[in-house]
Amino acid sequence: MHIHDWPTNERPREKLLARGATALSDAELLAIFVGSGLRGQDAVQTARDLLHRHGPLRPLLDRPAKALERLPGLGPASACKLAAALELAHRHLMSALERGEALSDPPSVGRYFSQRLRARAYEVFAVLFLDNRHRAIAFEELFTGTIDGADIHPREVVRRALLHNAAAVIVGHNHPSGNPEPSEADRAVTKRLLDSLELVDIRLLDHFVIGDGRPVSLAERGWLE
């Protein structure tokens, strides 16, 4: 059955317009770029097959446009649209930092860290420095390591924060394994950072752990109290 034969409220485009993009599954979102699908399949089934054979979503979409266009069901036009959409999303997240806007939306900050760190093959620990109105001052990657971890030095975070005259910081690091669940070591280093920054009256607002899917916020877990 072609998508045009589906009930209107189940078609990906109509569903997105009526209920927003978050209401769609990964396959439904991808189907919007796929278009008509392969012969004998609707676009959603083609998208499901792409995710099954070449997914999950992150490594699939991390491919350059030239690699995407070779996948069954995409082709040059769909690959270019996907690459352009991803780049627009990245620039949108960057724009708030470049304009020095107040960062009051934690999910957006988490997505920004994810854009910067998720594709790394080794662990990277980064810090976003903020002024007293929670406007971005700078973003720095302070520590790098191996696939198993990076050594974090709270004193260096404090030194850089003082250098930027920051009133608050948000930190984040990636898990190359793809599992974003914070480890005991992650919680321990967060406590050390809290204690060190508190000595110089700088707030640690959040610590994001980046892996596959949604970034994990330690503040949301109540682990920064």
Curated annotation (Swiss-Prot):
GO terms for biological process: proteolysis. GO terms for molecular function: metal ion binding; metallopeptidase activity. Zn(2+) binds at residues 173, 175, 186. Keywords: Hydrolase, Metal-binding, Metalloprotease, Protease, Zinc. Residues 102-224 form the MPN domain. A motif (JAMM motif) lies at residues 173-186. It comes from the Bacteria. PANTHER family: DNA REPAIR PROTEIN RADC (PTHR30471), UPF0758 PROTEIN YEES-RELATED (PTHR30471:SF3). Belongs to the UPF0758 family. This is UPF0758 protein XOO0462.
